[in-house]
């Protein structure tokens, strides 16, 4: 994994600031992203891991947009971002799992918290960019009963798509939907970040529909 190449690619895109454009498309943020930890149990719990360098527990693009969409479609959704141990640093992309062990363990602890604190909740999840690696790392290590409570997972710009053969290991493939834009090279085993990697806000409505369709 070429971290220097990743850094240069991100630097080349900074002037265009595509993440900021995504924020302008979906400026409303209805959640601080800590509703599982600090709120009441809801019928649905949404756990999300943001992209590298994004601020806030849900990030500033696909995370809050998908949270908002789910809240609009359903009565009772708790949105929870992975953090603060998951720091979404650029350097973590170059680690063997595409993210840090601390991030993976924190995500696992949130899935466990959802099941223990809110035994009747249905869990859905998502990740964007490095956040997809968090989900690829976290979900296979959960016990089977907890995996059964996870009804659907959506992954945007999946940095582990090629490595894991378009699926999350040891998790039903029909519960997963992976969004890889044409020309997004991170989906093909590289750390080359180009403009298509910042296009996933357009897939949020379809992703929300997919997650809603998986609920019982």
UniProtKB/Swiss-Prot annotation:
The active site is at 129 (nucleophile), 184, 197 (proton donor/acceptor). Disulfide bonds join 41-118, 67-79, 180-187. It comes from Aspergillus terreus (strain NIH 2624 / FGSC A1156). InterPro entries: AB_hydrolase_fold, Cutinase/axe, CUTINASE_1, CUTINASE_2, Cutinase_monf. GO terms for biological process: carbohydrate catabolic process. One of its GO terms (molecular function) is cutinase activity. Transmembrane segments: none annotated. PANTHER family: CUTINASE 1-RELATED, CUTINASE 2-RELATED. The lineage of its organism: Eukaryota, Fungi, Dikarya, Ascomycota, Pezizomycotina. It catalyses: cutin + H2O = cutin monomers. Keywords: Disulfide bond, Hydrolase, Secreted, Serine esterase, Signal. This is Probable cutinase 2. The keyword Signal applies. One of its GO terms (cellular component) is extracellular region.
